Amino acid sequence: MAAFSKYLTARNSSLAGAAFLLLCLLHKRRRALGLHGKKSGKPPLQNNEKEGKKERAVVDKVFFSRLIQILKIMVPRTFCKETGYLVLIAVMLVSRTYCDVWMIQNGTLIESGIIGRSRKDFKRYLLNFIAAMPLISLVNNFLKYGLNELKLCFRVRLTKYLYEEYLQAFTYYKMGNLDNRIANPDQLLTQDVEKFCNSVVDLYSNLSKPFLDIVLYIFKLTSAIGAQGPASMMAYLVVSGLFLTRLRRPIGKMTITEQKYEGEYRYVNSRLITNSEEIAFYNGNKREKQTVHSVFRKLVEHLHNFILFRFSMGFIDSIIAKYLATVVGYLVVSRPFLDLSHPRHLKSTHSELLEDYYQSGRMLLRMSQALGRIVLAGREMTRLAGFTARITELMQVLKDLNHGKYERTMVSQQEKGIEGVQVIPLIPGAGEIIIADNIIKFDHVPLATPNGDVLIRDLNFEVRSGANVLICGPNGCGKSSLFRVLGELWPLFGGRLTKPERGKLFYVPQRPYMTLGTLRDQVIYPDGREDQKRKGISDLVLKEYLDNVQLGHILEREGGWDSVQDWMDVLSGGEKQRMAMARLFYHKPQFAILDECTSAVSVDVEGYIYSHCRKVGITLFTVSHRKSLWKHHEYYLHMDGRGNYEFKQITEDTVEFGS
C-alpha cells in the first residue's frame, strides 16, 4: 500500500472522481436510450420489422454461431483464393512482428552508439536500418494488399450468395409484398454487406497482430525482467477487457438502428427521384421536403446519441486501454531496475542499464499497446455483431421465402366477417396448383390479398386456349389480384388452380418495363442473345415483330439492334406499349395477360395486335374499358368490388360497358 500511496494525490483523486461521474452519466444515458425505445409510439417510415423479434446484437455464443455460418459462405473450401489471402496476411503479420522486434533492437543499438560516441557503431547500425527499409516497406504493403483483396473476395462471395437467394424465382417480389420482416433490402445487400466484410477483415488483422506481438514480447520480456511482469499485464488485459466489453454492449443495437435509419433515408430519396414527375404535377415539393426532413431528423438525432455514446466510451477506452496500460507497464518494467539487490543488474554499468531498460521498456510499451489494441478491438467486434445480426436475419428471411414461408401481419378476419356469414379461415399455401397445357381453371379459389383482405370468397371459371376473356370492374375489385394469383406471385389460400407452367403465361402491364441493354434486349427480354439463337429466331424475324406493331422505323432511328440507350426515357409511352407487344409475339406464350397495355395505342393498331395474337394462337386475358375490344373476346369476367362476380359468354345480346 505504501508503494501506491504516492499516486493518491489531489489531482489523481479528481481524475478518478471525473471518471466515476462519467461512468454514472454513461449508465444513465444507456437506460434513457432503452426507455426511449420502449416508450416511443411513433412508427418509423417503412418500419415493417416485427417488434419483439428484434435481432440481438451482442458479443455472445449466438454472435459467434452466426459469424461462423457466414464465414463458411465466404471461405467455402479449405483450399481457395480466400484461404490463400488469409495465409498471406498471417505470414505478413508474423514478418511485421519480427520486423518490429528487429527495429527495436537495432534502434537501441543506434542510440547506444550515439550515447557512447562510437561513430563506427552508429554508422554500422544506421546502414543496417537503411538496408532493411525496402524489405520492411514491402512487408507492410503486402499486408495492405492482402487485406484489401480479402475484403473484396469476401464481398464477392457473400454478395453472390445473397443475390442467388434474392433473385431465385420471385423472392425479390415476395420480400417486399408478402413478408414484412425486412425493410429496405437494398441497404442490406449493398452497404451492410460491404461494411460487414470490411469489419471482419479488419478484426482479423487487429486481433492477429496484437496476439502475435504479445506472444513474442512475453517470451522476450520473461528472459529480461522475469515472468511476473508479463503475467501482470495479461491479468490487466482480462479485467479491463471484460469491463469494457460490458460497457460496449449497446453499440451493436445502435449500429442496427443506424443502418435501418440510413436505409429509410435512402428510400425516401429514391422514391422522390422515381416519382418526380407526379410530384411536380401536384406541386408537392413542400410536402416531400417535410417527409425528407422528418426522416433525416430522425437519423441525425440517432447519430447525435451515437456520437455522444462513443465519446463517453472513447474517454473510458483511452484511460483503460492506453494510459492505465502504460502506467502498469512502467510499474512492471521498473521493478528489476529499482530493486538494488536484483541479481541481473548487480554488476551492470550505467550504459548497460540504460540499454537494457530502453530495450525492455520499448518491448513492454509495444506489448501494452498490443494489449490495448485487443481491448479496443472489442469495440469493433460489438459493431460487427450489429452487421452480423442484420446479414443473418436477411439470410433467414431469404431461406424462408424460398421454402414458401413468409410472415406478415394478417388482419383479423373475424373482424371483417358480416353477421350471419360464416368466416372461413385463410391459410397461405392451402390451395393446390395443377400444371396443365391450354387451360386455366379456378375451382373454389378464394381471391385474397396476402394480409387477409378477401376480395372474392369463391371463384369458379374455366378458360381453354382460343377463348379470349375480357376482365372488367371498378378499381380495387380484384383484377390485378387475380393475375398475381395466376402468376404465382401471391399465395393460393384454397381451392384448385389449373394453369400452364410459368413460361407459358406472359404478363404485359400498362407501364412496360424496359431493361438495361440494347434495342434487341427490349424485344427478347428476359431472354439473352444466346437464348434467341437457341430458339432459332433471327434478327429479321425480330424486325417483323416490330413491323407488326408499327415500330419498324425505330430500328433505323436508334442505330440498329446493338444500340444501347436509356430506353425508359428514349421511347414514348405508346412506343413502350407497342414494344411490350412485340416482346409478347417473340415469346409466343399459350396465355397472355394484357393489363391496360394498349391505353396509349391507337384503335387501329390495337385491333391489328389483337388479330395477330389470335392468328399466332395466343389466348388473351384483357383488362380494359374500351368497348372496341369486346369483339376480340369470347367471354367476360365482371367483378363488382363487393365480393361478387359474373363470368359469361359474350353474345350479340351482351350489353357492352366501357368507353
Swiss-Prot record:
Sequence ranges assigned to domain ABC transmembrane type-1 in this UniProt record: 85-372
Residues that bear N6-acetyllysine: 61, 260, 399, 533
Glycosylation sites: 12, 106, 206
Record EC number: 3.1.2.-, 7.6.2.-
GO cellular component, one term: mitochondrion
InterPro entries, alphabetized: AAA+_ATPase, ABC1_TM_dom, ABC1_TM_sf, ABC_transporter-like_ATP-bd, ABC_transporter-like_CS, ABC_transporter_sub-D, FA_transporter, P-loop_NTPase
Modified residues annotated as Phosphoserine in this record: 659
PROSITE patterns the record matches: ABC_TM1F, ABC_TRANSPORTER_1, ABC_TRANSPORTER_2
Coarse class of the protein's main subcellular location: membrane
GO molecular function, one term: fatty acyl-CoA hydrolase activity
Protein's UniProt name: ATP-binding cassette sub-family D member 3
Organism: Homo sapiens
Gene this protein is translated from: ABCD3
